[in-house]
Amino acid sequence: MEQGAEGLSQWPVAPHQFTEDTEKSLSFLDMSSSPGSGGVHTSWNRGPSGIRRVPQCPELERMSLASAQAPRQSACEMGQQFSMSPPEHGLSYCPQMTFTASQMVYSQGMSPSQPGMGAFKGAQAMPLGEPSISSVAVTFSGNLRMPPSGLPVSPPSGIPLMSHIGMPTMPYSGLPTVPFNGDALTPNMFLDPTMPPTEVQAVLPSLAQMLPSRDPQDFAMPPAGSPSLLPLESQGSFLSQPVSQEDFPKHHLCEPRREAQNSRAQERASGRSSPVSRPYHCEYENCGKAYTKRSHLVSHQRKHTGERPYKCTWEACTWSFFRSDELGRHTRIHTRYRPHKCDQCGRQFMRSDHLRQHQRTHMRMPRSPDPQADSGRRAGPLPAPHL
């Protein structure tokens, strides 16, 4: 206590002004909405001149922890927690996100660069009840304004930075005490210290799109080459463990395969449709047939004219044919000449197509060594004798 008193005597601040600043820094405005609105707890420190300079000493930090622990624990049970400075000086908020695929921890350091912006000195990941779920506390800093609806929006675009306030609430331990240093701070992990405020405000809305939605199946992040991740990749990775590829939607590149299949199908179709050269066309009306040989065209034209030059010379036979091969098959009926013989049963046929049709019957039924038994099986069972 004596060392704390000596530390207090070293600061050129009046006692009554120091007490007034301490009480104002520890005052909280609790705003608890209904469960349907997401359970938002808002707290800010108002003062006549914005954020004041508070001496950093161990005794004051213990007092701040003791006095702010009770309201913060009740606020954490309601859901996400926002810590805000006055709207005219800026806004800093800490949304809480939960990832089930892999535990990710955001760690952020601050460096003084520009005035008029709220600041936090680090955020820690708080464990939850389930061992497989990790709570991630993310700290953003920038010039923001608070509309009447309650969502922080960026001044140039008016896009809400937190669009998933209605997430399921989970209790966690209170965040560490946030000491105000008086100087404005900006994050040096997400953005370059020399980056102008307009680029800072342009990057923050893109970070809000990476927050998960209610439905775990809708969890998706922009690809690695997207413009929203370029400033993050330039400063290094901010995740302790990489997210597995199972959490990202699988993109199947089927377009080249489909194009290749279509080209192959077209080639096959063109191969079928490309006929052999048929220079001999039938000139009769509504016919349009073509042939590779002139003899085939002549025999075809005989069907149009009705001419049958090939006549059977067998006695008492009046058959005539368009082609000579047809006449030769017909004469075998009279001579009983059957040149085509089955090698399994010994039957003979006048035409080769009749032999092939007969050989299919042997494939459908078991082979019999006796040709007569085979012929009797084809004829059918014998009738039973009458007793």
From Swiss-Prot:
Zinc finger spans (C2H2-type) are 280-304, 310-334, 340-362
Q: What one GO molecular function would you report for this record?
A: DNA-binding transcription factor activity
Q: Which GO terms describe its cellular component?
A: nucleus
Q: Compositional bias (Basic and acidic residues) spans?
A: 257-270
Disordered: where is this region? 28-54, 213-234, 257-277, 357-387
Q: What keywords sit in the KW lines?
A: Activator, DNA-binding, Metal-binding, Nucleus, Repeat, Repressor, Transcription, Transcription regulation, Zinc, Zinc-finger
- SMART domains from the UniProt entry: ZnF_C2H2
Stretches of Polar residues bias are at 30-46
Primary localisation category: nucleus
An example GO BP is:
regulation of transcription by RNA polymerase II
Q: Which SUPFAM superfamilies match?
A: beta-beta-alpha zinc fingers
Would you say which domain of life the source belongs to? Answer: Eukaryota
Compartments it resides in: Nucleus
Tell me which Pfam families the record gives: zf-C2H2 (PF00096)
The record's function comment reads:
Transcription repressor that binds to the promoter of target genes and prevents their expression. Acts as a negative regulator of epithelial-mesenchymal transition and metastasis in breast cancer. Specifically binds the 5'-CACCC-3' sequence in the promoter of ID1, a key metastasis regulator in breast cancer, and repress its expression. May be a germ cell-specific transcription factor that plays important roles in spermatid differentiation and oocyte development.
Q: Which family does it belong to?
A: Belongs to the Sp1 C2H2-type zinc-finger protein family.
Report what the protein is called.
Answer: Krueppel-like factor 17
Q: What is the lineage of its organism?
A: Eukaryota, Metazoa, Chordata, Craniata, Vertebrata
Name the gene. Answer: KLF17
